[in-house]
């Protein structure tokens, strides 16, 4: 829907580990040739420094496992003050962040992959990543396949995986 309605640019906003995850997909997108107006910013910098490219037509993408990250909550408020739309991920529903974002995704243990699906979906919709559907299909198998990868990696990992992952 956001892509259909149009947008000026995309801001990946986070703090701590969330910013780290956002940064990984930001750089991956660039390596894939992404020409979308994509910005990566620390939530505190977003709040206090601002960005001349940020407008009511921007899309802000945030995540917070707890749903209570204060800087991210404040970034959502700032986005809404100018009329920008916010896409968010949390693992705990009925939290401030879950209640504030315009589009919410919630699950457990999927934040890293979620960042990839969001940014790559924007790229797909812009005609810049035609392998999106294949990637998402492959990612659905990761939880079960990763255990076998651990087992195949070395004997110590196999012992651990046999004991705790099956």
Predicted region positions:
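Internal, active-site/partner-interface "lid" segment
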Residues: 124-162
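Acidic catalytic cores of enzymes that act on phosphate-bearing nucleotides/polynucleotides
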Residues: 35, 164-166
